[in-house]
Amino acid sequence: MAKLKYTVGDVSAIRRSIAEGGDVWYNKKLAGVKKNIKKHFKDKCLRCCYCQRSFKGEFDLVIDIEHILPQSLYAKCMFSPKNLSIACKRCNMKIKKASVKFIVDGYHKKRIFNKSTYKFIHPNLDAYNKHITRINIELENLSITKYVVKNNSQKGFYTYRFFRLFDFECQDFDLAQGLPIIERYI
């Protein structure tokens, strides 16, 4: 998939918004830019960059443009394509918020977009499927969802815990058979 590229109009809107100051991301001049960003990432992968839940058939309102490095702390990275993706409201607003706990201690500021700077699976620097496999099977009203960390990946384990992926793991088939639910926490 091609990298996110801004149009001349996008760059102009971004510059005007920054020049006006204030809360730049919420400037109305950026509506078209945000639409283009969201479209780019939806075309790339119609899933949350953290939990991999599908956005297929979802309205744009439930899909957030995600700033991997929070815009409140890393304003200079606000429009950097490496710092943008799409995420579900749960992962973006409920869990991650403006946290930076996922950045390794002692990282070099000039290497902020180096994958070794991040404890979790970075949406643009890492390949999710090299760290975690998400298995989801649905049959009528029953479903099974399981996240499997591959090759003892530390990024996989961190992502699993940080984004509470175990909350999504369903064992409806066990319930249907009257079997007890087994604790899934790592």
How should each PLM-predicted stretch be described?
Residues C45, V62, S85:
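Residues immediately within or flanking Cys/His clusters that coordinate Zn2+
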Residues I65-P70:
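Histidine-centered catalytic micro-motifs used for acid/base chemistry in nuclease
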Residues M1-F41, S54-E58, A75-S85, K89, ...:
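Extended charged
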Residues Q52-S54, I63:
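Long, hydrophobic/aromatic-enriched structural stretches that serve as scaffold segments
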Residues R47-C49:
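Short, well-structured hydrophobic secondary-structure segments
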